Amino acid sequence: MAEVESPLKLSGAPPPPEGVGGGHCSEISTELIRSLTELQELEAVYERLCGEEKAVEKELDALLEQQNTIESKMVTLHRMGPSLQLIEGDAKQLAGMITFTCSLAENVSSKVRQLDLAKNRLYQAIQRADDILDLKFCMDGVQTALRNEDYEQAAAHIHRYLCLDKSVIELSRQGKEGSMIDANLKLLQEAEQRLKAIVAEKFAIATKEGDLPQVERFFKIFPLLGLHEDGLSKFSEYLCKQVASKAEENLLLVLGSDMSDRRAAVIFADTLTLLFEGIARIVETHQPIVETYYGPGRLFTLIKYLQVECDTQVEKVVNKFIKQRDYHQQFRLVQSNLMRNSATEKIEPRELDPVLTEVTLMNARSELYLRFLRKRISADFEVGDSMASEEVKQEHQKCLDKLLNNCLLSCTMQELIGFYITMEEYFMRETVNKAVALDTYEKGQLTSSMVDDVFYIVKKCIGRALSSSNIDCLCAMINLATRELEADFRDVLCNKLRMGFPATTLQDIQRGVTSAVNIMHSSLQQGKFDTKGIESTDEAKLSFLVTLNNVEVCSENISTLKKTLESDCTKLFSQGIGGEQAQAKFDSCLSDLAAVSNKFRDLLQEGLAELNSSAVKPQVQPWINTFLSVSHSIEEEEFNDYEANDPWVQQFILNLEQQMAEFKASLSPVIYDSLTGLMTSLVAVELEKVVLKSTFNRLGGLQFDKELRSLIAYLTTVTTWTIRDKFARLSQMATILNLERVTEILDYWGANSGPLTWRLTPAEVRQVLALRIDFRNEDIKRLRL
């Protein structure tokens, strides 16, 4: 029997994939089928063929379904045939035109390149010829100019020679005329060296004789000879001698001046001002010359030399200032006095006043001068660096910062300001202490003298620091003033308020004695004790009220000072003084100052609370308690009698008015209004307590409503505080006490409340309803609130 595949292998072969077109033939050949003899093998082959038949049928069905689409596409393709033939012809024609154009362009561009090459060679030839002619012209011209002593013209010829292209000259030397060119070059080089020597000699003679026109004449020639640095160096040396001569002359005038002169107190500041103005005039005068003849970016070199001389002269002036004003000696005395438990004799603050003013003026003039230099150099660099890289610009900025920040002028002023801050601190502290010690009160005034005196001193010290134009100095003084106001001055006011308002009842007397003992104990611990004796009650009351006014004015003055400083420093920052870091430091100092204002407000609230509890509450409570002695379970006759002869509220209002009138004359409007607000809160709380202890009938509730309305109407006229909100609970209690029946409350409660917000809880509503003697408890308990 022929060898055939096993049925398992045949049956395990994968069927052809469905839906795949393309005439797949069966893998089972006719010969294979004929060779099969077993039934099982025949069945396996049969199943395989059936599967292939089904796949072919599916593929055929899919092709038949696409027949219409394919036929329509074929029709479309037949129609497109003529058009495609036309397009093919046009495309061939276009390709031919492009090929022709490309060839033509290539021919033209090659000829243009040849023309460019010829033109460049022609230009080079012309340049070479021009340079040879220029060389000959320069050689002839410089000889003639030197003979005629026309040094400007000679320098112009040398400058023209120096600008010639050296490579062209080198090529010319290799040509036929090389020997002639070498001769011309040698003559020009000799003329160059000769002219340099002449210019240097003439410039030296002019500077020695002080002939400014001649100095400027030869100064302009240096850059034509390529001697930029040499020219700037020599010219700067001449200018520095001028500066030194004038500065020494001014210093001699200072040392010989009359100390009674009007400007004697600031004579050293004036001397520095003259020095700075002289240098500024030199820069303004010669900047156009430097820019024109030396080019932009060269002004920095000139100013660098001038600043060295400026530092030398500043050092001389400052040394004379320190010696003549005893600046260091005064600083040492101040430093010793600032130390606790120091036995050094105290220096009088007013002796420091003129010295401190002069130091800040000196620093202000220095800052103005340095800002002038920064502005001029930056503008010059900006023009010169217009095409430079970012690295070059940054390097120039570093050089500028180094020059101005590290110069001796800046360091010296920084040292003087460091001493100034310590001395100004001493001046402020001592004068503030003196103002507190000499505190007086004039009748009719709301505040005592020390408030105006202290803030005059603080403003003067901060203003003086501000006038220095040094942000670090200003911030230091703001911090010192903040500390002085917060610690020392606030403690003075705080101790006065802690003495309390004079007591009027036995309980208040006991509290006042305890407070006084605490203050005395605190004073003894600090080594200070006031031996003036115990003031009378009226004086103590007035002292307490004046202190309250002082605290309120201090808070307002600090806020005003903060706003003023913000405005003044905005102008400083707009002038370019300081930067973002200085702005942040200044803002931080102002925040600390504002915090002190808030602490004074807190102290004021503590004082008001003490006044309210000591003076208002002991009086108001008994007046409110008389409400309990007035019956509110009344008949029609009594109700009418109450209307004619009010039993409580009118007298209560009169008592309040009389009591508050005493405070109104002695307190500032702001404090009086705050005290009135505390009083109204007290009245609302205490009245609610006595109402809950009373009983009412319908007419009594109506009477209470009238009394409450009268009281609210009066209190509304005496304060700007919101009264109705404080009396909202009492008003709702009056509404409840006016109800005709218990269930009427439901017309005002819950969903029926409308815009009304109930301040009373359901339990409190039931408590108020229970005050009505004509309401039954059973009805009240049945309410669903």
Swiss-Prot record:
SMART domains: Cog4 (SM00762). It is found in: Cytoplasm, Cytosol; Golgi apparatus membrane. Residues 741-785 are annotated as: E domain. It holds the Pfam family COG4_C. GO terms for biological process: protein transport. The modification Phosphoserine is found at residue 6. Residues 85-153 are annotated as: Interaction with STX5. It is a peripheral membrane protein. This is Conserved oligomeric Golgi complex subunit 4. Residues 618-740 are annotated as: D domain. Residues 2-84 are annotated as: Interaction with SCFD1. It comes from Mus musculus.
